[in-house]
């Protein structure tokens, strides 16, 4: 696991790769999320991330349990957010609206992003604190 920022973590925003790593039972991701929940850190997951990762069935017990935790906020892509995501897509030249929503949400909340794809997120927001899994 690699961290790109030395600032203290105020909360975590998860991308699709983070949920897929949890689904696979990745011990580093499980430990990171367990510590975050124990410390009472807020966790956010954009709704598009859930849509990309969700396939249902018994394989996703860990993901379902995490999403059901009251400390985890699944952020909707409502009208205002969709417009902000569209503007940021235009400014950054990045066309993946889920990646852009992850970045926007983390930036708004002062969160660190847990990601398997730091290169794409760094294109959108070069200074965004990341934990690579």
Mark where each language-model region is.
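Alpha-helix capping/helix-boundary segments
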Residues: 18-19, 49, 81, 101-102, ...
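Short, polar loop motifs at secondary-structure junctions
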Residues: 58, 115-120
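Acidic, metal-associated active-site segment
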Residues: 53, 96-112
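Short loop/helix-cap segments at secondary-structure boundaries that form the rim of catalytic
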Residues: 119-127
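Acidic catalytic patch
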Residues: 71-92
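Short, well-structured N-terminal submotif of metal-dependent ribonuclease cores
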Residues: 1-45, 54-66, 131
């Amino acid at each position: 696991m690699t961290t790109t920022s030395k600032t203290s973590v105020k909360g975590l925003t998860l991308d699709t790769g983070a949920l897929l790593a949890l689904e696979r039972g990745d011990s580093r991701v499980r430990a990171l999320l367990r510590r975050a929940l124990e410390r009472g850190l807020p966790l956010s997951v954009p709704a598009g991330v859930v849509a990309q990762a969700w396939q249902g069935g018994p394989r996703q017990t860990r993901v379902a349990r995490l999403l059901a935790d009251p400390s985890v906020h699944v952020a909707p892509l409502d009208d205002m957010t969709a417009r902000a995501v569209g503007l940021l897509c235009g400014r950054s030249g990045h066309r993946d609206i889920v990646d852009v929503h992850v970045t926007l949400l983390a930036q708004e909340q002062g969160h660190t992003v847990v990601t398997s794809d730091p290169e794409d997120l760094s294109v959108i927001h070069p200074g965004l604190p990341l934990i690579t899994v």
